[in-house]
């Protein structure tokens, strides 16, 4: 599914809004994600840290787990916005790409050559990749059949 610029910008704004809920007292780096389901619903997520570090969760996985728990298991795109906790979202920070674990979790539910990963610095400044570009030669459910 090809997304129009307005749809991409809407996802970016929703991800920036989700970032405001991030709980990041240790890294002080807040991330928000907006995941577009095949049902056309948008599922949001933010990163949630923990003093023990490993129990924390990334924004992208929070959005995926929320969507799956609500019955959606097919996705079209995700927008990701990140930056230092004390900075406003959508200021010119660097692009925030999903970690390897998040890429693999997304891979479970999407066609990697068609799923759009939108990395945004601002509403106007963003990059769009397919998951396949970010996770080449990936392992997925079809490998277990």
Over which residues does each language-model region extend?
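C-terminal binding/interaction regions
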Residues: 2-21, 72-145
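Small-residue (primarily alanine) positions within well-ordered alpha-helices
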Residues: 15, 33-34, 63, 67
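Compact, glycine-rich, soluble single-domain proteins
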Residues: 47-61
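Short, solvent-exposed cationic patches
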Residues: 58-80
């Amino acid at each position: 599914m090809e997304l129009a610029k307005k749809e991409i910008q809407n996802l970016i704004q929703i991800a920036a809004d989700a970032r405001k809920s991030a709980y990041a007292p240790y890294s002080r780096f807040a991330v928000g994600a907006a995941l577009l389901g095949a049902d056309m619903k948008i599922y949001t997520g933010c990163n949630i840290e923990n003093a023990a570090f490993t129990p924390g969760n990334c924004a992208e996985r929070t959005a995926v787990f929320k969507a799956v728990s609500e019955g959606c298991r097919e996705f079209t795109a995700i927008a990701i916005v990140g930056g230092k906790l004390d900075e406003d979202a959508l200021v010119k920070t660097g692009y925030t790409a999903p970690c390897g674990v998040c890429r693999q979790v997304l891979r479970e539910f999407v066609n990697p050559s068609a799923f759009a990963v939108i990395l945004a610095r601002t509403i106007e400044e963003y990059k769009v990749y397919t998951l396949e570009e970010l996770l080449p030669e990936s392992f997925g459910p079809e490998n277990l059949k």
